[in-house]
């Protein structure tokens, strides 16, 4: 199955590098108990309005750039999206305990709070650059959602996030349809895990809005060689509806700049989701290049057309909207 376009991969690869630097810089190699988190007086996620956010994406790989970036986010965003990979070994036995991974994640969340930012969490068991792979599984672990170790660590990590950070919105995997396409024999195992963990979350935090994200362009069979013979622009609704009735909102990612110029985007490319569900919708990841990259032609006007399409087609029911980057990276 084909992966996402090179520009998207480049942006996400650098974002992952930045996240690793942030974890290392903020934690200073220490582990210890996670202290209680300050609550925002008026959290954006409780406003009842569409909220806007970004991935953490400082322009330079320096601590000063990270600190400055969070200050900028505090001015321009309502929230930051944290999409950490699961620290498998730290959580296979229990949700409780102390570890460097817990401290690292908590320090990032604290920095967000200090800058007046709400946060949304997405639990991510897979490789962000290749959704056919698990990320950093311990040696000897079977890469399958049927594996009891995988299921235990996934569950315990998710419950730790719920108990520690109390997020209003919580995702239980990203772009999961790409994994389901690659490993249809394992799809039912993830679906059952999702339903199990959803139930556990609701017992502890019934107001938490739980979802899983779907790669919209792939769901619409727009990738050449990755459609498995399915018709373009005919969404694979069965992949979303396998998670019902336990989707509190329908959430997508989309990078359409390599499929069609912004001006030629179908008028109902996104809005067709509104006709399929009465639930709120959200964009958990996305972007559109403003210049030609790797053989893909794009302009600032195309980027504006993409933003306008999201706004006009989904705006009436949009719970939150994440654009991948607040700023370009300084690659020097």
Question: Residues of each region from the PLM?
Answer:
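Short, well-ordered coil/turn segments that N-cap beta-strands
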Residues: 46-50, 76-78, 115-119, 166-168, ...
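Ser/Thr-rich, Proline-interspersed low-complexity disordered segments
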Residues: 19-46
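Substrate-binding cleft of secreted/luminal carbohydrate-active enzymes
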Residues: 282-332
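N-terminal substrate-binding region of glycoside hydrolase catalytic domains
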Residues: 36-152, 171, 175-177, 251, ...
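Active-site groove signature of glycoside hydrolases
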Residues: 157-187, 211-213
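Aromatic-lined carbohydrate-recognition surfaces of secreted/lumenal glycan-active proteins
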Residues: 172-174, 193-232, 280-291, 318-326
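Alpha-helical scaffolding within the catalytic cores
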Residues: 62-70, 103-107, 154-158, 216, ...
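Aromatic- and acid-rich polysaccharide-binding/catalytic face
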Residues: 82-84, 165-168, 172-174, 214, ...
């Amino acid at each position: 199955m084909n992966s996402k376009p090179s520009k998207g991969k480049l942006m996400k690869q650098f974002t992952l590098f930045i996240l690793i630097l942030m974890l290392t810089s903020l934690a200073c190699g220490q582990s210890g108990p996670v202290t209680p988190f300050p609550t925002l007086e008026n959290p954006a996620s409780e406003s009842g309005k569409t909220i806007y956010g970004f991935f953490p994406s400082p322009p330079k790989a320096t601590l000063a750039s990270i600190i400055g970036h969070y200050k900028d986010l505090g001015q321009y965003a309502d929230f930051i999206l944290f999409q950490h990979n699961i620290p498998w070994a730290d959580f296979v036995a229990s949700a409780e305990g102390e570890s460097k991974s817990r401290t690292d994640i908590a320090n990032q969340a604290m920095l967000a709070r200090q800058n007046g930012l709400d946060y949304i969490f997405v639990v991510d068991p897979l490789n962000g650059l290749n959704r056919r792979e698990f990320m950093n599984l311990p040696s000897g672990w079977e890469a399958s959602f049927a594996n009891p170790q995988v299921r235990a660590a996934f569950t315990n990590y998710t419950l730790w996030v719920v108990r520690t950070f109390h997020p209003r919105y919580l995702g239980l995997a990203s772009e999961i349809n790409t994994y389901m396409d690659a490993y249809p024999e394992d799809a039912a195992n993830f679906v059952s895990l999702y339903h199990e963990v959803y139930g556990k979350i609701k017992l502890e935090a019934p107001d938490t809005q739980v979802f899983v994200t779907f790669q919209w362009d792939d769901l619409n069979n727009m990738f050449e060689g990755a459609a498995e013979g399915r018709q373009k622009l005919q969404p694979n609704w069965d992949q979303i509806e396998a998670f019902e009735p336990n989707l509190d909102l329908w959430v997508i990612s989309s990078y359409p700049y390599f499929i069609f110029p912004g001006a030629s985007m179908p008028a109902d490319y996104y809005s067709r989701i509104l006709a399929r569900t009465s639930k709120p919708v959200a964009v958990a990841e996305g972007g559109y290049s403003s210049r030609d990259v790797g053989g893909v032609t794009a302009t600032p006007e195309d980027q504006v057309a993409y933003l306008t399409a999201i706004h006009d087609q989904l705006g009436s029911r949009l719970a939150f909207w994440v654009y991948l980057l607040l700023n370009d990276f300084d690659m020097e």
